[in-house]
């Protein structure tokens, strides 16, 4: 178990993906300008093949297809452009989905025949840079053909939100701490974690009050755009594809610490008293490192049993954690507290590498060929050699959702 290479990118890394387990890597990062998006093609030794810079929104957006074509979303004039970058760095086809001047792409997913996009109000940075009025359009989800033709568009009504753990204090409460009454969000954005997932004939699109952190997930029919169901307002959390048309929706904060499984009808079929970066294997078993906003840590690696109970794995120190990957033997690998850790099927933990590092911005772990594991820490990419086997096949985040970083289960 060795650190085989490490290399620095122009800015904080937002995404690392590859179309082939042997590389090269396609890295999406910020540039020196926080509104710039930089795309870098680099091999596992750190040798750069090409690099391109795009205007951004403060939220670099990209998705990699199975053939190695990267799609980048960025503002262009008064609209938004989806541009493809071919494996050699040249420009491929583009799509210009119709939108309002004050809208931007909050998240998108590549489909086999087009795109699904979550639209939100343009970021404050972009609106201020362009001297635009601070209008706040309602969010929406839309599906497009490959050329950009809109097939359907569905408005999202987040509505008034509230949660029992949210409190307020002021003149209205006589300066006493009381539960906050339901409120209408002033600004709505896509959720920070896994905001848009597509599985079989269902979409899970998550939107949140950007100031209060209370949000909802909306389940839509992929073919028609019809809203099938929506979760109740709750603190946002990690999410995953749990199977065809099925999703895991987590909630963490204000006293919430749960994960629910939802079927294709949007009905909750299971709920666990745990929240984390969960893996779902080919048999539908769920496990992963817990993520809780507290120190000292009381998190563990947990297995979420079918009867809604928890199976305890090893205790986890520290706080900041990468999303894990899993090999075909069922061993999970992830970065936490300055260590590269594995947890095997017996729930035994093993430390593969450690260094004094407390960086807070950590990308997901990618498991590549010959046991190579890639993790990004802030503006740096680290490549490790490990004894792990090939990447497992399963709904999340194995297979395409792991390597390509495109949350789609066809």
Give residue spans per PLM region.
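An edge-strand/N-cap motif at the start of beta-rich repeat modules
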Residues: 1-46, 396-397, 401, 407
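A short beta-strand motif characteristic of beta-propeller blades
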Residues: 3-9, 47-53, 91-98, 150-154, ...
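Repeated scaffold domains used in trafficking and secretory/extracellular systems
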Residues: 10-19, 55-65, 100-112, 159-172, ...
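Short coil/turn segments that connect the beta-strands within blades of beta-propeller domains
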Residues: 22-23, 67-69, 112-114, 200-202, ...
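Short, conserved, GDST-rich strand-edge loop motifs in beta-rich repeat architectures
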Residues: 30-31, 120-137, 207-212, 291-295
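Beta-propeller blade signature
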Residues: 39-43, 82-89, 133-148, 215-222, ...
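Loop/turn-rich, solvent-exposed surfaces of beta-rich toroidal or solenoidal domains
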Residues: 296-297, 310-344
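Blade-level signature of beta-propeller repeat domains, shared across WD40, Kelch, NHL, RCC1
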Residues: 360-410
